[in-house]
Amino acid sequence: MAIVKCKPTSAGRRHVVKIVNPELHKGKPYAPLLDTKSKTGGRNNFGRITTRHIGGGHKQHYRLIDFKRNKLDIPAVVERLEYDPNRSANIALVLYKDGERRYILAPKGLSAGDTIQSGANAPIKVGNALPMRNIPVGSTVHNVELKPGKGGQIARSAGAYVQIIAREGNYVTLRLRSGEMRKVLAECTATIGEVGNSEHMLRVLGKAGANRWRGIRPTVRGTAMNPVDHPHGGGEGRNFGKHPVTPWGVQTKGKKTRHNKRTDKFIVRRRGK
């Protein structure tokens, strides 16, 4: 994998930094594992904007990813690594011994030709998925389940990982990248290693149009709007003279947004700011 800085042949290329991975498949994706993905423009069924700054962008197909890793005790060979427009991580197409193909998140260090396996008796090896009761304390894992059988929900983006720091009774304690420490049932499945493509954070798009290709529209500051459009709008100069709020008047910048008291007991330590 290489980090390439483009030559300044135009204003739009001047600051571009690309991530080039020669291992990625250059052809089309595996058609049986594709699904349609329709654009909403951030609108709901009434046509009202429910998510701002979304619209346009290139057409995409959704890749059906196996987050559950529930094909147990059947070895699979990695056929190829692929780009996925729906996520920052790359994906791997694997062929199981019984002939079935699936997409999985591509961990760091996994290459075409490698063998992976899921199940309680799988060896501790990058790309293998096991219940966390069978994974040694101190191991680095990704694609971690919060509920047994539901599929991985934690540490799925490029370069993400979680460390198992303790095992006590039916629970393991995880340290997340944010600094949060939380308990998860030891029966939950996790995949060994960290998610690949960690250089994703180093890329520079270089121009506004590159964000538009991705379906991301401009974000306008409230203080640049009129009073009718935003609580920060209007006035002389740039100072809006009040506590910062959202366009709907809800306090922001530091306001707590978590409301799930039911799972508070599983959080051993809050994330660091």
UniProtKB/Swiss-Prot annotation:
Region (Disordered): 30-50, 221-273
Gene3D superfamilies on file: 2.30.30.30, Nucleic acid-binding proteins, Ribosomal protein L2, domain 3
Keywords: Ribonucleoprotein, Ribosomal protein, RNA-binding, rRNA-binding
Biased composition range(s): Basic residues: 253-273
GO biological-process terms attached to the record: cytoplasmic translation
Record carries keyword Zinc-finger: no
Ribosomal protein keyword on record: yes
GO terms, molecular function: rRNA binding; structural constituent of ribosome; transferase activity
This protein's GO CC annotations: large ribosomal subunit
Subunit comment: Part of the 50S ribosomal subunit. Forms a bridge to the 30S subunit in the 70S ribosome.
Family the entry assigns: Belongs to the universal ribosomal protein uL2 family.
HAMAP family (alphabetical): Ribosomal_uL2_B
Role noted for this protein: One of the primary rRNA binding proteins. Required for association of the 30S and 50S subunits to form the 70S ribosome, for tRNA binding and peptide bond formation. It has been suggested to have peptidyltransferase activity; this is somewhat controversial. Makes several contacts with the 16S rRNA in the 70S ribosome.
Protein known as: Large ribosomal subunit protein uL2
Designated gene of the protein: rplB
